[in-house]
């Protein structure tokens, strides 16, 4: 199953594509960031995100996408910008008939480390190790997008007899410790 993870941001939208064969066998296909300049009008920035994300979709043909949920910022302007960016991303996925799953930051951290308070560096190390990458993905938004894709892998009900026929389900947006593998303990101790 090919999964597109997205970390939405108006200036930098991170994306990561992984191919999952099982919970433990996940290969990174590619990752990167879509950058827009603050000096460009909002509509053009959203169009850039749409166009570049469409190119990623056309190239990798993801079966599902996962995106970070909007969480509350202190700055109202940031909330609006990320909300508008998410709208452009959700529309792009919808027009391509790609099911889109949303995860809050704490759920992503819990899925990868076993606890929801992991710091950014711990998350980046887990992504690097789990996906067998030579270095931590840069910029941070790309690493976050890969983490969101790997988080989605943990919500897949893998049929032991036929991994090609994996069915997807969403677990109440909060992962139960017993319902997922703890990648942090499995890979290394931090």
Swiss-Prot record:
Catalysis: reaction(s): Endonucleolytic cleavage at a junction such as a reciprocal single-stranded crossover between two homologous DNA duplexes (Holliday junction)
Listed EC numbers: 3.1.21.10
Cited CDD domains: RuvC
Pfam families in the cross-refs: RuvC
Source superkingdom: Bacteria
Residues where Mg(2+) 1 binds: 7, 141
Protein name (database record): Crossover junction endodeoxyribonuclease RuvC
Organism: Endomicrobium trichonymphae
């Amino acid at each position: 199953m090919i999964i597109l993870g997205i970390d939405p941001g108006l200036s930098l939208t991170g994306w990561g594509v992984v191919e999952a064969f099982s919970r433990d066998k996940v290969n990174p296909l590619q990752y990167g960031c879509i950058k827009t300049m603050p000096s460009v009008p909002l509509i053009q920035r959203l169009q850039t995100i749409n166009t570049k994300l469409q190119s990623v979709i056309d190239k990798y043909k993801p079966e599902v996408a996962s995106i970070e949920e909007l969480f509350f910022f202190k700055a109202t302007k940031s909330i609006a910008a990320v909300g508008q960016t998410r709208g452009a991303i959700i529309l792009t996925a919808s027009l391509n008939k790609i099911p889109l799953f949303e995860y809050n930051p704490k759920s992503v951290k819990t899925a990868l480390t076993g606890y929801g308070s992991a710091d950014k560096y711990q998350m980046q190390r887990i992504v690097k190790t789990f996906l067998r990458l030579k270095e931590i993905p840069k910029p941070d938004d790309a690493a976050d997008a890969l983490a969101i894709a790997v988080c989605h892998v943990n919500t897949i009900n893998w049929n032991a007899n036929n991994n090609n026929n994996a069915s997807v389900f969403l677990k109440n947006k909060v992962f139960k410790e017993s319902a997922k593998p703890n990648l942090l303990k499995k890979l290394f101790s931090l």
